Amino acid sequence: MNITPFPTLSPATIDAACKIARDQQIPLLISGGIGHSTTFLYSAIAQHPHYNTIRTTGRAEATILADIAHQFWHIPHEKIWIEDQSTNCGENARFSIALLNQAVERVHTAIVVQDPTMQRRTMATFRRMTGDNPDAPRWLSYPGFVPQLGNNADSVIFVNPLQGLWPVERYLSLLTGELPRLRDDSDGYGPRGRDFIVHVDFPAEVIHAWQTLKHDAVLIEAMESRSLR
């Protein structure tokens, strides 16, 4: 069994993946090169109270996370598999599958750990890549944690805050950007669109919530701010 974390991760997601790998003593496959969100990871690591000693600038995401896994979670080097060339979700899946296929022993089950905002799309991408292949691993989904938002007197906050979470504005930006990609229409990533992922069903209440967020003036302003570009 393998744990496979991917880019766009918050430190809280990294911790979730490393904890499983350490506790279960199973291999940890880390996927991620240098992409459009890498600077967000650099910033998150620099601000982390423990991980800020890790060198980041100019390095692939997977190599940074591998350092965290080894230095802070004491996962042996031989248990860490690094894929450091991918720059997007599709390449994460394709290159990781290729690496798993090189394993001496067949991998029957893999736990996919991703930032919760991208977990659904990542799973749909893996299932699209392997299709009906009977030799493909069984993909298990584990986002590590599920953020919940609430209102206080001043702003929107995380109800269940964890160390290393994205700022709320960054989280909402990622979340609202995922919904159009997950849709199975001409503009989405499903079979009727760009065919990057398997079909994903949308409950009516999710579509309604997305429409509400998409047209919220405060959120639009936040998403257009420099911090979310």
Placement of each model-derived feature along the sequence:
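A conserved mid-domain beta-alpha-beta active-site/ligand-binding segment of alpha/beta enzyme cores
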Residues: 148-211
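Extended hydrophobic packing segments that form well-structured cores
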Residues: 203-229
